[in-house]
């Protein structure tokens, strides 16, 4: 503990983390300030807000939003920082089918535009199948298997 590993500070500038509970990361007084906080520019923040469908909420307080809106704002705020790696912890929790489809479409568009790596932690088979190129099945903290989309289908098909 006396010495940090070399380069330990560099990773947090490259990795954007979105927590399962958006309340853990929403702290600014408006959606605009939340998404603009770490954004590479105000214009890019507005572009990301538009992509995530939250631009119309620009002047609202994040805590006044629905859970689905909070989730989209929290992901948009991290995405606006333009990280090389976007780590999403259960991004579709609490979403109805329409919300899940919309969020998956947004995340796929974001990936196509930015070219960033997305790592998604999920128990939602639909989310995994729609977002992943590679899948890792983990049990008791150990990777049991890895593969492509076919692994998701194979593992979760009765």
Language-model segments: what does each one mean?
Residues 86-89:
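Catalytic Walker B motif of ABC-type/P-loop ATPase nucleotide-binding domains
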Residues 61-65, 69:
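Conserved ABC ATPase signature
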Residues 128-130:
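A short, surface-exposed alpha-helical micro-motif characterized by mixed small hydrophobic
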Residues 122-123:
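H-loop/switch region of ABC-family ATPase nucleotide-binding domains
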Residues 142-158:
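Conserved beta-strand-loop-alpha-helix hinge in the C-terminal portion
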Residues 75-76:
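Hydrophobic anchor residue at the start of the ABC signature
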Residues 43-57:
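Conserved ABC ATPase "signature" region
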């Amino acid at each position: 503990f006396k010495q940090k590993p070399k380069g330990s500070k560099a990773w947090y500038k490259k990795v954007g983390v979105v927590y399962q509970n958006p309340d853990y990361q929403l702290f600014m007084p408006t959606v605009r300030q939340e998404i603009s906080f770490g954004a590479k520019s105000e214009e890019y923040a507005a572009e990301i807000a538009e992509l995530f469908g939250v631009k119309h909420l620009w002047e609202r307080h994040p805590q006044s939003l629905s859970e689905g809106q909070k989730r989209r704002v929290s992901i948009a705020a991290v995405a606006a920082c333009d990280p090389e790696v976007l780590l999403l912890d259960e991004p579709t929790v609490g979403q109805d089918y329409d919300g899940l489809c919309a969020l998956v479409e947004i995340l796929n568009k974001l990936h196509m535009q930015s070219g960033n790596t997305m790592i998604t932690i999920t128990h939602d088979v639909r989310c995994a199948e729609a977002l992943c190129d590679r899948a890792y099945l983990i049990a008791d903290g150990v990777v049991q298997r890895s593969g492509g989309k076919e692994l998701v289908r194979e593992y979760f098909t009765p």
